[in-house]
């Protein structure tokens, strides 16, 4: 999990670090939960991932749920919103986008779960 180093931060930087940590925790919970409806968010796969077949898609979903290997390269803001993994010899990415409750635009306050809906997309790098 993330850790905030507060030794040399302005109050604004500290607030931003707290916001990002909240988003990271919410993204982790979202990745690991089983959605009963779309009140929290949606999972989608690209056409190219879907074309690999149901076993491949299922393997991707399981791997995303278990994923913990976040790197600064793939997740530079520490929000745990993007990762890279290998599935059956293929590089697969996932990313989490944060929308308003109507899925029409970005959330005004991504750290507030009542104002944010998540969309997790599983994709190949070539889909990006």
Q: What are the roles of these predicted feature ranges?
A:
Residues 1-3:
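Eukaryotic low-complexity, non-globular regulatory regions
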Residues 81-128:
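Short, compact, well-ordered microdomains
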